């Protein structure tokens, strides 16, 4: 085994490195330690010299950019004849950095945005995308006209910040028109101005070239119809004005017209004479309604005059009605339940032969009696049945003989009741004329007199 402690030749340990070399090696990887040994020295007495060289010195604190110029860097690397690099400055640098545009790809067949040339039709057509759908704006003869149509639609759809082909100042006049129209209406305006609109179209709203050579004015989608025909005219302007008048009449001041609505202001103001006639017509209507209401009040107040006990009102009404009220069925239907309850409290009597089923009220009876002939009213013969008595209130039946201290004129003594044979003949004749089966009811002749009813018959 080797004796390491008693080694005869102990090699001298190399001297430690300088602290600067240790620090530089730990701090940066660009530093290197180089050992230089002179050639003329003896092997035994040779001194080892360690030199540290920094190839890339650290940056100066607080300074920006390179710490030394380009020739100093060449000196570090000991490179001869290396030219210093030149930094790119000036407008060329700004041009190199391009701004990302919001615009999409341009048309492949046109230099304008939103314009495409179709060889089949030979026209330049304009389109715009809205909500994921392509909206057709029309076909034009030139690409410039199609581009202007696209610009107007883009401003309407996306505002003044939209990407357009020309300057925004060129469309200042169109901005006013855009504010009054919706998207759909503005698209229709652009299509009418295009040359690719269907045959017979016009640049005016509601105007179409008829096959006879004249211009037809019409309104579309009015009152559920497809269109309303307004007439044929010699020129487009006349047809457009006819459409404007019709639109103003239907939609008022908010109507969309071809020309300025102010030029039609004088046509829709009614003249003074027409206003006077309308006032007289309204006066006649008001008088007619007041007369009708007065008549209704008089008819409705007849019962009050008879039963109220006022005195003079009942005797002053000398009018003879020409016909009974025609709405008696409606009035009777409304009070059917009340009359049924009232009739249930009175004994039911078999009715006498009734020729007519018209309603009869005390005021009508008074009118018949006041005509002078108690048995006849305008040549009309009536037979009052017992069934009618149940429809009158009891207070009217009791107070009919003396209302308000006045005595009613009593008709002359009624003729004796007809015999059974005469009644049967009358019933048969009445049934034959009215197409109803005959019905004869017999009862005591004194019952009518006890209840205050008298038969009205035509005198022979």
From Swiss-Prot:
Cellular component aspect of the GO annotation: nucleus; transcription regulator complex
Give the region (Disordered) as residue ranges. Answer: 1-39, 87-111, 284-319, 398-429
- The annotated regions of Pro residues compositional bias extend over 409-419
Gene null: resulting phenotype: Several spikelet and inflorescence developmental defects, including altered florets palea and lemma structures, abnormal numbers, size, appearance, and identities of floral organs, reduced primary branches number, and longer and fewer grains associated with a loss of grain shattering. Crook-neck-like rachilla between the sterile lemmas and the rudimentary glumes in place of the spikelet abscission zone (AZ).
Residue ranges annotated as motif EAR? 283-287
Swiss-Prot/TrEMBL GO biological process terms: regulation of floral organ abscission; regulation of flower development; regulation of seed development; response to cold; seed abscission
- Relate the assembly described in the record: May form homodimer.
What is the protein named? APETALA2-like protein 5
Q: What is the lineage of its organism?
A: Eukaryota, Viridiplantae, Streptophyta, Embryophyta, Tracheophyta
